[in-house]
Amino acid sequence: MINAFRGAIASLLFAPVAWSQSTLPTAAEVIAKIKGQAGIEMKPTTVDTFKAGDPSTRVTGIAVTMMATLNVLKAAVARGDNLIITHEPTFYSHRDTIAVLESENDKVLATKRKYISDRGLIVWRFHDIPHQMKPDIIRTGIVRALGWQSSFHAEDQEVFDIRRASVRALAKEIGEKLGARAVRISGDADAMVSRAVLTQGFPGFVANRHAIQRGSPDVVIIGEDHEWETIEYVVDAISAGQIKAMIVLGHIASEQLGMDEVARWLRPLLPGVRIDFIPTPDPFRFSR
């Protein structure tokens, strides 16, 4: 009886609410709704916090993005969105720490903060929660975009048995599907591969190494990493004949469409609030 009562209360608290134009939610109300729906216990060290703006501001629209660059902010303003939900930092460090840049009167920081302030934008980071969701909603979006839903191992969602293809063809296909303009290959680009380990963003050397050990892949696909850690490790594994090749996508491309998945997840939760997915362009391209 008590559990049933608690369940009823929870369903009322976190059920979709259609706001009218005159009673648009505040940014704080929107974020509370998101946290409640995700059901993830927040750690004191989480980076999923407001980074700029007044959370009591009423939301005219939500821009969901991989990275709140100045160009993305301008695109959000053009659409009439004032709440920016970004996966990655806004102010150039994991915790958006700005004290040093402020003390140096950094012009880039000042320009961005002024733009946010002048237009009444609110920026909230959505990084830890999506990766802790079951399944990881960022990974879900990438797997959907690649069409690999039936290819991953049930016991390890970083390991995929994929259609046999050359490394070159695989890199081209992934780049096109994920919007990566500067995909890099290490190893034999003409080698045929069918078992992949895919990690996203920047999980770090330990996580990448463990995924490789678990998956025993012939191709490793990553977002980014230090060249003296995962990159060097895989280069040595290629030299030793343990792996055929590595594909490096770039951080943004390796997670971007996961935020498109987030936008899809948010729309039924927040009816009456416009939600736009605004892609962050791959910052790199080849010089030739």
Regions found by a protein language model. Name each.
Residues M1-I9:
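Bacterial N-terminal signal peptides that target proteins for export
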Residues A15-V17:
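N-terminal signal peptide c-region/cleavage motif recognized by signal peptidases
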Residues S20-R288:
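Active-site catalytic microenvironments in core metabolic enzymes, especially phosphate/sugar-handling
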